């Protein structure tokens, strides 16, 4: 497929992943989002795309067969230009007009109703559970890559493309936010699917607050802001061989969740704390979070 088949409509934005365009498919009349990223060529005599990139795209194309409603569709992939050193790859996604950041900003005061937040969270977690069940760690969840359709359907975007995006991000002078990063990522420790659940907790709180929960300006500052809420973790939970020792942080105890998200009732506060658990092995999974009582009872029901 050639991207010339699509008619560009507008530039949506320039981010860490490159430039994104809204385009129209004249055959179907549907709008799509085009993301062009540069990928370094693989080794060997033939050059071309590295096998890791080919595998990554192949996995995402296989996911298409499931047509999960809470995951953005990757409709096509094509290599559009090539030099000796790199190949320009264009990813064709379904187009969704707004992200969660825009959706939250558009909500009139005092913000989204609690039942709307619960509905968004259920959809968010279903999409994430689907990715995790297919061994995909998102690694960069934030309001800007959670899309919300005009009908209120949540769709996760920019997942499963870590290797494709890493080269482009190194070329792009965009500061990648630390605000949604899990402690194990900030400490440069090993990580897996629980990193996404930390991000979910930050976003869950932000749906109520209408502003980010932890706004650090460096890894150490971000960790300090996290510990101001959850307390300094015990030595047993601190990962070994990491960039910052536990002793670099002053001792402090946890604060009540309601001190930063006063709108949360007790079971919601409990769910948030299970997401914002320092030790990733003790952090709640997307699957278990979906079973949590908070997401299944109407506001005002007895605890």
Curated annotation (Swiss-Prot):
Keyword Cell inner membrane: no
Domain of life of the native organism: Eukaryota
Residues annotated as domain Protein kinase: 6-295
Secretion signal span: none
Active site annotation, chain numbering: 140
GO biological process terms, semicolon-separated: cell division; cellular response to interleukin-4; cellular response to ionomycin; cellular response to lipopolysaccharide; cellular response to phorbol 13-acetate 12-myristate; G1/S transition of mitotic cell cycle; positive regulation of fibroblast proliferation; positive regulation of G2/M transition of mitotic cell cycle
Single GO MF descriptor: cyclin-dependent protein serine/threonine kinase activity
EC number(s) given by UniProt: 2.7.11.22
Annotated region described as Required for binding D-type cyclins, given as residue ranges: 50-56
Keywords annotated in UniProt: Acetylation, ATP-binding, Cell cycle, Cell division, Cytoplasm, Kinase, Membrane, Nucleotide-binding, Nucleus, Phosphoprotein, Proto-oncogene, Serine/threonine-protein kinase, Transferase
Subunit structure: Component of the D-CDK4 complex, composed of CDK4 and some D-type G1 cyclin (CCND1, CCND2 or CCND3). Interacts directly in the complex with CCND1, CCND2 or CCND3. Interacts with SEI1 and ZNF655. Forms a ternary complex, cyclin D-CDK4-CDKN1B, involved in modulating CDK4 enzymatic activity. Interacts directly with CDKN1B (phosphorylated on 'Tyr-88' and 'Tyr-89'); the interaction allows assembly of the cyclin D-CDK4 complex, Thr-172 phosphorylation, nuclear translocation and enhances the cyclin D-CDK4 complex activity.
Functional description taken from the UniProt entry: Ser/Thr-kinase component of cyclin D-CDK4 (DC) complexes that phosphorylate and inhibit members of the retinoblastoma (RB) protein family including RB1 and regulate the cell-cycle during G(1)/S transition. Phosphorylation of RB1 allows dissociation of the transcription factor E2F from the RB/E2F complexes and the subsequent transcription of E2F target genes which are responsible for the progression through the G(1) phase. Hypophosphorylates RB1 in early G(1) phase. Cyclin D-CDK4 complexes are major integrators of various mitogenenic and antimitogenic signals.
Protein name: Cyclin-dependent kinase 4
Organism: Ovis aries (Sheep)
